């Protein structure tokens, strides 16, 4: 596996490791087998994955989804987020974070990040909490 450090923020002390994917012939065969079944997001291999993942994590069940937006949407629904609710989200994030909130019927409340570590700012969260969040 080949690694590089890329400086994502010009003056930042944070380095993000860049890793090239390692795809074996076995991986390619498994991918082609799935593609040949015309089942990209559902099917027998997904059921096997869900069972194995549940077993691996010690969970009773696991649900495989096709992308992170779907996973975030299911997570929001699972915790009862609904129309009229507000969900705090950092301003430095991928659009899927806010999109999943919108698809759930809630409103994203975008807050600042910390300049020190680029994570969501605790003070921004505290200032944005209300009855709907």
Where are these regions (language model features)?
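Conserved PLP-binding active-site segment in aminotransferase class I/II-type PLP enzymes
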Residues: 1-78, 82, 103-104, 121
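PLP-dependent aminotransferase-like
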Residues: 77-133
